[in-house]
Amino acid sequence: MSRLSDHHVIVANDIIARCPRPKSALIPVLHLAQEQDGYVSTDAMEHIAELIGITPAEVYGTASFYEMFKFEPVGKYCINVCTNISCQLLGAWELLEHAEERLGIKSGSTTTDGMFTIEDVECIAACTEAPALQVNYRYRYRVTNEDFDALVDDLRNGALDDEIPPHGTLARVRQTTPDNWADTGRRAQEAVDAR
Amino acid sequence: MPADDPGAANGSDGGAVSGVPTGPKLITTRFDQADGYTYDGYVRSGGYEALRRALTAMTPDAVHDQVKTSEIQGRGGAGFPAGVKWGFLPDGVFPRYIVVNGDESEPGTYKDRMLMELDPHQLIEGVVLASYAVGAAQAFLYVRGEMALAQERIAQALNDAYANNLVGTNILGTDFSVDIHLSWGAGAYIVGEETALIESLEGERGMPRLKPPFFPAAKGLYLQPTIVNNVETLSNLPWIINHSGQDFYDLASPTSTGMRMFAVSGHVNAPGVFEVPNGTTTFRDLVEAPEYCGGVRNGRSVKAFIPGGASAIWFFPEHLDLPLDKATVDQAGSMLGSGAIVVMDDTTDMVAACWRVVRFFARESCGKCTPCREGTTWLERILKRMLDGNGRPEDLATLVDVCESISPGLAWPPKQTTICPLGPSAVSPIVSAVERFRHEFDHYVEHGRPIDGVERHAIHGTSGVAVHV
């Protein structure tokens, strides 16, 4: 809905400055937009295009390739149930079915109160801990139906607020550009580009 | 439901009771150390000693020589020797880049995420060592988008490493400088293919590049010479420098050197990730030994297993005694790939298993090459209608025909009509399952249901991704 906030512009410019070419910052900056609004809005994509110096169509062209970017609001909590082979073998589809019944929605949709979205997703690299799921990209392992119910209760009553930020926020620690950033790679690449 | 706390890998050193090959832990030593992921915890347990030694007492060529001597094979899937790969860089062309492939997404694979979450400094030390060896002034650490904790831990580790002069300008007072830039994806399996990863790093759609050049070492990131290495591969470098390439080489078999991480999942009693002697440990050791998985669940037997990730040709009980050796497994007609073993017991519905792996490739096809984009989609649809009880008598022949169009001859290693191996990877489960369990497919077509005695799954999802174009 909105352009990037002043704070996010500072973060975005810091990321852009670290890249040998500005467009390399595109995916991380799209994540910033999603962190701000919970999804990637058209206004944000236009703003990002200005910051990076490309067209809005190029921004959308890249963004629409990647499954994590949402172009409409989703739930505060996106619950991604892995159904790939290791999880399928140990009951992932049954877990997904339970999740759908518990929340009263089908996979791929959002509860009317805007709290939960369910997705059935591909392998999330927790194969030895099957069946596994992620809530806003935070893991839960060997999940039973009872575990799922408790998880939903905890999310609703705020018991997991510290651990699980709202959808859109990935890492809560950012790489900062330190004083001793060498910048030799970028300068060398700029010299190549200038030739 | 344990909280967001990755389980520790079990090493094989000490307490071996069943005669399995043993060896030291090289890269999982800090998995049991509560603060192993922090700067203090890493340094206290010997971290950054290899970097100090390399920068102050070794030339870049000497570091490269140790890696060559170790003959460490890339741990990402292709198994190409890292030292040889580095040697493909053209002389005198700068800037050149190191890119770390942390986009672990191959179904069954779980080890790079552990290494990034539990020992990020070990990876960073490996990246600086590699950059020093090949003369890179900038490195890119690309982490899979869905791995929030790994991104947090690596960001913190990089900030701490910079603050302690272990990355950045004039590292440890020497004249060597390198920057490491943390970047990450946004959900796309194909980005694990190295040229697609480079496209993604350039802010593009993650589609593989046309070959040649076959190696990014010639033209990679920004069309400059680039080395793309896997997380596990680079995490081994501190150990190799602290000891020697020869020590690493001597640990296991001459054709598969060093220790290696394997994730064993599926129908076993104790699934887990284990760092074991490469090349000498067998599949049976991993599945049955009490210090590893402790056998198949409920005392059942193995019906089939995937030896190296979803792209691999499946193996069967007669393959259990093969060693985890690249040459041996290649010769037996499959691959060790990314160290991902998925065990299926005798209650497994092979049509359902086959469909699930194929659905993965259909969903993850980037769409660049027609045989893959169209072919994987049709394979998935045909298998799904069989599962739904609507299979047609001609379906099996159609499946094989479509497979032929993606990978002519259905040989191993696969021939391909596509730019990258994703399309042919969707052929592997079909060739494996149809050849061995043809009667299960026939039964579905004839009766609309699986054979007796196999477990049915409540498969109902389509492509349940929220509000996506």
Labelled PLM ranges:
Chain B
Residues 1, 5, 50-67, 94-98, ...:
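Ferredoxin-type iron-sulfur electron-transfer modules in oxidoreductases and energy-metabolism complexes
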Residues 11-64:
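Cofactor-/ligand-binding subdomain signature composed of acidic, glycine-rich
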Residues 42-49, 101-112, 218-221, 263-269:
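Gly-rich Lys/Arg/Thr-decorated short loops/hinges at beta-loop-alpha junctions or inter-strand turns
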Residues 68-89, 185-199, 203-205, 362-375, ...:
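Conserved phosphate/anionic-ligand binding catalytic regions in large, soluble enzymes, centered on
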Residues 78-79, 83-86, 109-112, 151-156, ...:
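Short acidic, glycine/serine/threonine-rich loops at helix termini
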Residues 119-133:
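Histidine-anchored nucleotide/phosphate-binding helix
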Residues 126-130, 279-297:
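Short amphipathic, charge-patterned alpha-helical segments
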Residues 151-278:
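Hydrophobic alpha-helical positions that pack around
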